[in-house]
């Protein structure tokens, strides 16, 4: 099977081309993918596909979504956390968050992460490998199957750095956005990055209308370098310049993610410095109480300090929200469940 291709890694155009090359009508490609997006992963169960075609498909492709290793539902049932396993045994996490306006899934783009952000559990142990776009898509399809509900929004904020897996991340976006795919609007898709400056500029040229989220977490280089190794490669000034380039190219508002760590980046002077840094930008700041990680000693800011930080930004004209905490009772923060699973098993999976 591992010498064959997962059909989920093919776009409609790819499959049309394959059909033509194999002397079949190209409309069969859409019929096959229609079944796939309905959750049918057995070629023989595709009732309107002739046997001669299903035989060819079985000889060249396999259809696989990840299996569920563990599933956790929060007490209020607003959050469902999945540990998914791929065919090679690697484990990743996905989280479904249920809102009044629809269901959002947080997907992983890599197994582990090499970026080394110190407040993120996903990066402990480094990166194992990147996921193909079909493997990322499989998270969405499996989550829909497990919850019995449609996913209407996607955030690429799970383990991994999407821009370090650039081609697969963009192919995934285009596949879920396609009318013949999940038909999720680009403005309902958010890509989060720690700030790989050249890739942000490259993304600006892609003619996409997705939301770009930047993990900023500090108003200056000195603080940012303490928690994010990427800050030693690209300065805050370079990052903001790339963000302004992205805004000018796409006319899309950028979200800046800011995890508040007690006595590190949460003082009034930091809020004022951040307000100055972002003044005049088409942007929004999302303040995040930092998550507790067993291996780390970070402490979240107090509720009062978070509110005060928010008020300073708001008074400076910076659109600001405080992230609603969801799934805290099931360790739904990025990387925590996978890390615990790996620690409790004698062999890395």
UniProtKB/Swiss-Prot annotation:
GO terms for molecular function: 4 iron, 4 sulfur cluster binding; metal ion binding; rRNA (adenine(2503)-C2-)-methyltransferase activity; rRNA binding; tRNA (adenine(37)-C2)-methyltransferase activity; tRNA binding. GO terms for biological process: rRNA base methylation; tRNA methylation. Keywords: 4Fe-4S, Cytoplasm, Disulfide bond, Iron, Iron-sulfur, Metal-binding, Methyltransferase, rRNA processing, S-adenosyl-L-methionine, Transferase, tRNA processing. GO terms for cellular component: cytoplasm. InterPro entries: Aldolase_TIM, Methyltransferase_A, RlmN_N, RNA_MTrfase_RlmN, rRNA_lsu_MTrfase_RlmN/Cfr, rSAM. Its cofactor is [4Fe-4S] cluster. Its EC number is 2.1.1.192. PROSITE patterns: RADICAL_SAM. Gene3D superfamilies: 1.10.150.530, Aldolase class I (3.20.20.70). It is an enzyme of class 2 (transferase). It catalyses: adenosine(2503) in 23S rRNA + 2 reduced [2Fe-2S]-[ferredoxin] + 2 S-adenosyl-L-methionine = 2-methyladenosine(2503) in 23S rRNA + 5'-deoxyadenosine + L-methionine + 2 oxidized [2Fe-2S]-[ferredoxin] + S-adenosyl-L-homocysteine; adenosine(37) in tRNA + 2 reduced [2Fe-2S]-[ferredoxin] + 2 S-adenosyl-L-methionine = 2-methyladenosine(37) in tRNA + 5'-deoxyadenosine + L-methionine + 2 oxidized [2Fe-2S]-[ferredoxin] + S-adenosyl-L-homocysteine. S-adenosyl-L-methionine binds at residues 160-161, 192, 215-217, 291. The active site is at 93 (proton acceptor), 334 (s-methylcysteine intermediate). It comes from the Bacteria. The keyword ATP-binding does not apply. It is found in: Cytoplasm. The keyword DNA-binding does not apply. SUPFAM superfamilies: Radical SAM enzymes. Specifically methylates position 2 of adenine 2503 in 23S rRNA and position 2 of adenine 37 in tRNAs. Reaction proceeds by a ping-pong mechanism involving intermediate methylation of a conserved cysteine residue. This is Probable dual-specificity RNA methyltransferase RlmN. The lineage of its organism: Bacteria, Bacillati, Bacillota, Clostridia, Eubacteriales. The gene is rlmN.
């Amino acid at each position: 099977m591992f010498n064959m291709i997962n059909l989920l890694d093919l776009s409609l155009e790819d499959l049309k081309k394959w059909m033509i090359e194999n002397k079949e009508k190209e409309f069969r490609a859409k019929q096959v993918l229609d079944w796939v997006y309905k959750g049918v992963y057995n070629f023989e169960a595709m009732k309107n596909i002739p046997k001669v075609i299903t035989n060819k498909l079985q000889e060249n492709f396999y259809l696989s979504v990840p299996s569920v290793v563990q599933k956790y539902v929060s007490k209020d049932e607003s959050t469902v956390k999945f540990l998914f396993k791929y065919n090679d045994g690697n484990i990743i996490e996905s989280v479904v968050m249920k809102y009044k306006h629809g269901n959002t899934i947080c997907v992983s783009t890599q197994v582990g992460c090499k970026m080394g952000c110190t407040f993120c559990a996903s990066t402990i142990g480094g990166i194992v490998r990147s996921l193909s776009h079909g493997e990322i898509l499989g998270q969405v399809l499996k989550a829909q199957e497990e919850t019995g509900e449609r996913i209407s929004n996607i955030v690429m904020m799970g383990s991994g750095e999407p821009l370090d897996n650039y081609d697969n991340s963009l192919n995934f976006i285009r596949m879920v956005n396609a009318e013949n795919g999940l038909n999720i609007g680009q403005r309902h898709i958010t890509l989060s990055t720690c700030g790989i400056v050249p890739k942000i500029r490259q993304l600006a040229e892609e003619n996409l209308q997705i939301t770009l989220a930047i993990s900023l977490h500090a108003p200056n280089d000195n603080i940012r370098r303490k928690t994010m190794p990427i800050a030693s490669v690209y300065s805050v000034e370079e990052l903001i310049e790339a963000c302004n380039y992205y805004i000018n190219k796409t006319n899309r508002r950028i979200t800046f993610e800011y995890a508040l760590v007690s006595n590190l980046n949460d003082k009034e002077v930091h809020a004022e410095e951040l307000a100055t840094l972002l003044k005049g930008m088409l942007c929004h700041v999302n303040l995040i109480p930092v998550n507790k990680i067993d291996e780390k000693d970070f402490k979240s800011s107090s509720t009062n300090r978070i509110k005060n930080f928010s008020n300073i930004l708001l008074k400076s004209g910076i659109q600001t929200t405080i992230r609603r905490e969801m799934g805290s009772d099931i360790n739904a923060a990025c990387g925590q469940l996978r890390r615990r699973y790996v620690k409790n098993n004698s062999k890395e999976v």
